[in-house]
């Protein structure tokens, strides 16, 4: 049976479903067919997801769009019932590049508008990935242009730190509705989450499973899927450890972005609304924090506006 996530209201009055399907292919093997993205999107909509997250840099917007189109054609959903997020890449940060970049994404997605457009990183790069010195405040002007043109219903950012969020809010007439950042048990981001929420900016959480899902990194900090704290919660609520971690984020007021191409797991990852963790259980998971990221962006550490 399909399970639909509740929605919350953003600071611009629009609403957003509180679970999104992630479509980034960072852990995909070269042998994996990109068509699995189209199939995953279709299965997700079939399972009740109404929020799909993608990005220009994922190079799968066409497949995301195909999955959406197929679901609409088969009567599973209407466009208006869906919430689609995509992101501006680092080499399109000049104000006059933003709207054309979004138009290119819309063309690939087969959509007339995007529900949420994000600046993927505060870092600007040239096409060869060398550093550029474009201020993200200029980029935000282009994002505001996109919203005024009706191409993006809502606009926000991703991977911004607290100082950058404060500076952006102080120098813009449209406040970002979202900061999408990595949040999981080993990277709980409590100060940044609290800062965003205090400004009325919602937080989307990517890499929600952290290192609990084996990623093959040596020296990665705990917990793992057999951790006693997590397995006790899974047994108590009759859920998987993955579902416990997603519910942990929801109970912190966050919007998790689980990623899967497995039909059963896609459905499992939204089956989160018949239980709730206690304050003490959320606090116990917070204790795993090591400020250790799954997604390593340190290659850009010497670039202007690196969000350390």
Swiss-Prot record:
Tissue distribution of the protein: Detected in hemolymph (at protein level). Detected in larval ovary.
UniProt keywords, alphabetically: Lipid metabolism, NADP, Oxidoreductase, Steroid metabolism
Regulation: Subject to substrate inhibition by high levels of 3-dehydroecdysone.
Induction: Up-regulated by the insecticide diazinon.
Catalytic activity, EC: 1.1.1.-
NADP is among the record's keywords: yes
Alphabetized Pfam families for the sequence: Aldo_ket_red
Residues at which NADP(+) binds: 22-29, 53, 158-159, 215, 259-269
Protein family: Belongs to the short-chain dehydrogenases/reductases (SDR) family.
Entry function: NADP-dependent oxidoreductase with high 3-dehydroecdysone reductase activity. May play a role in the regulation of molting. Has lower activity with phenylglyoxal and isatin (in vitro). Has no activity with NADH as cosubstrate. Has no activity with nitrobenzaldehyde and 3-hydroxybenzaldehyde.
Protein name: Aldo-keto reductase AKR2E4
Native source species: Bombyx mori
Lineage per the UniProt record: Eukaryota, Metazoa, Ecdysozoa, Arthropoda, Hexapoda
């Amino acid at each position: 049976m399909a399970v639909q996530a509740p929605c919350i209201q953003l600071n611009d009055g629009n609403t957003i479903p509180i679970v999104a399907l992630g479509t980034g292919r960072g852990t995909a093997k070269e042998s994996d067919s990109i068509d699995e993205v189209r199939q995953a999107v279709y299965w997700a909509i079939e399972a009740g997801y109404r929020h799909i997250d993608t990005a220009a840099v994922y190079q799968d917007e066409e497949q995301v769009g195909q999955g959406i189109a197929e679901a609409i054609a088969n009567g599973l959903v209407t466009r208006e019932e869906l919430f689609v997020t995509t992101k501006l890449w680092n080499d399109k940060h000049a104000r006059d590049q933003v709207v054309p970049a979004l138009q290119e994404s819309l063309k690939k997605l087969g959509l007339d508008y995007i529900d949420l457009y994000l600046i993927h990183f505060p870092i600007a790069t040239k096409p060869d990935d060398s550093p550029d010195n474009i201020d993200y405040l200029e980029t935000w002007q282009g994002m505001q242009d996109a919203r005024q043109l009706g191409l993006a219903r809502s606009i926000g950012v991703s991977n911004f730190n607290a100082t950058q969020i404060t500076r952006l809010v102080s120098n813009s007439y449209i406040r970002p509705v979202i900061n999408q950042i990595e949040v999981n048990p080993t990277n709980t981001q409590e100060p940044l989450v609290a800062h965003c929420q205090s400004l009325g900016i919602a937080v989307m959480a990517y890499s929600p499973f952290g290192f609990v899902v084996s990623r093959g990194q040596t020296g990665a900090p705990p917990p793992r899927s057999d951790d006693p704290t997590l397995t006790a919660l899974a047994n108590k609520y009759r859920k998987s450890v993955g579902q416990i971690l997603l519910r942990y984020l929801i109970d912190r007021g966050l919007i998790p972005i689980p990623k899967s191409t497995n039909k059963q797991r896609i459905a499992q990852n939204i089956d989160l609304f018949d239980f709730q963790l206690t304050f003490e259980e959320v606090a116990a998971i917070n204790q795993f924090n090591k400020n250790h990221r799954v997604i390593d962006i340190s290659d850009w550490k010497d670039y202007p506006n690196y969000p350390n």
